From Swiss-Prot:
Span of the annotated motif 'HIGH' region: 132-142
Stated family: Belongs to the class-I aminoacyl-tRNA synthetase family.
UniProt keyword Transcription regulation present: no
Protein name: Arginine--tRNA ligase 2
Quaternary state and interactors: Monomer.
Gene3D superfamilies: Arginyl tRNA synthetase N-terminal domain, HUPs, Isoleucyl-tRNA Synthetase, Domain 1
GO molecular function, one term: arginine-tRNA ligase activity
Organism: Bacillus thuringiensis subsp. konkukian (strain 97-27)
Keyword field: Aminoacyl-tRNA synthetase, ATP-binding, Cytoplasm, Ligase, Nucleotide-binding, Protein biosynthesis
GO cellular component, one term: cytoplasm
UniProt keyword Cell membrane present: no
One Pfam family of this chain: Arg_tRNA_synt_N
Amino acid sequence: MNSLEQVKGLIKEEIQAAVLKAELATEEQIPNVVLESPKDKTNGDFSTNMAMQLARVAKKAPRMIAEELVANFDKAKASIEKIEIAGPGFINFYMDNSYLTDLIPTIVNAGEAYGETNTGKGEKVQVEFVSANPTGDLHLGHARGAAVGDTLCNLLAKAGYDVSREYYINDAGNQIHNLALSVEARYMQALGLEKEMPEDGYHGADIIGIGKSLAEEFGDRYAKADEKESYEFYREYGLKYELAKLQKDLESFRVKFDVWFSETSLYKNGKIDQALAVLKERDEIFEEDGATWFRSMTYGDDKNRVLIKNDGSYTYLTPDIAYHRDKLERGFDKLINIWGADHHGYIPRMKAAIQALGYDKETLEVEIIQMVQLYQNGEKMKMSKRTGKAVTLRELMEEVGVDAMRYFFAMRSGDSHLDFDMDLAVSKSNENPVYYAQYAHARVCSILRQGEELGLATGGDVNYKLVTSEKEVELLKKLGEFPAVVADAAQKRLPHRITNYAFELAATLHSFYNAEKVLNQDNLELSKARYELMKAVRTTLQNALAIVGVSAPEKM
């Protein structure tokens, strides 16, 4: 695809060719070509220090080497208009604008596919995120994890990875036991029978509602049923209700999972016993003080970990090891877990487990999501004013909307704390980054509607070479960066780079709009070229916002 990355590739090839032509070094002696984009654009679009790198090998002054490189460089092959030497021997390259203007039809014709790369080469990646206990509402930490996780999945897919989204349902622990007992108590109370809530029960209104629903639908059937049968019923009914609620909230947040994996299935399908057998066979576990231990210190953990306690019960780590073995047996090349900040200390033992099972520790990556602090009217907001409890994903969606939440949560690196300004998130001003990006899209759509009225949408030849002004060239360069931004952000697992890019593209568009009369009835040939440029901006901005899970409105 026609992009700035291709230009960089061509420049690097021609630099290497120039080194050989000038006989400054042999092929084996040529160092890696480093190309940078100068902040000051008067120093060119790209710059290299190759002359300085070659000084020792060529036994010449860098400035002289630079002159020989320039003399042997094929500008036409690399789409370069001019080359300048600066300072002690920096070589600055200025792109040929015709290469940039070719981007316009390339982007327009690619449509939704613009920005796609084959960086991932089809590598199978599983991203497990959110995975909140199904015993209550999703809080803001979960919401941020959902936004970052889903954006990362969209980004990886755009960059050519084969991505699977997975939610791990913690349905085998004590929380689910307490949920079942809470449902039972509320059911009995709805029937008018005396039943105390468990000490660690769930006292929310939704559990009271479940109890009433059960009483209306089943009468006293489960009050009289066998204790084991009724317990299983309360457990399944409560779990099903809570999961449905989670799924509804996540889908409203534009997050859909490919797999909902039950922890209980690990027990039912013998996966835990199988994982323990593998560890035993590999001599990774030992018995001590009546417990079974994992030799995690072998792999850099700060201490060995108990897998089976002396009462025969498993620690949290044991089903987690079985779960990760199951993931790897499903054929994933890479596992990415998105965890809350409270799980930071858990990473070394899981990395150790991956190695103990016979896999490279880099097979597992863990991205940590830090907490969110809400602000309203300039003050910290600790509790919901409506419920008096922690603010939930659902409640914040109702307050500020999905677009603002998705953008704000994905706007910073996940491992940094996030201050979420609710007033800013709903403001219709340039200070609001999501409004700023969306308004740029709406502005482009408005220009395109004007273009249609001028008859610019009729097709026919377009003279792209007319797109030459300083602001137009800035816009073209920013458009050309998108595939490289996608590839780099995906490789480095930095989804916030996409919100950064959307903001930068919006700023470049607004700058162009404020400096130029975009469409001019007196110059329809230039207007036609700019109309196509605006279509390219619309496509690129839509594609960037789509990765973040944010809508691109046509009017605002």
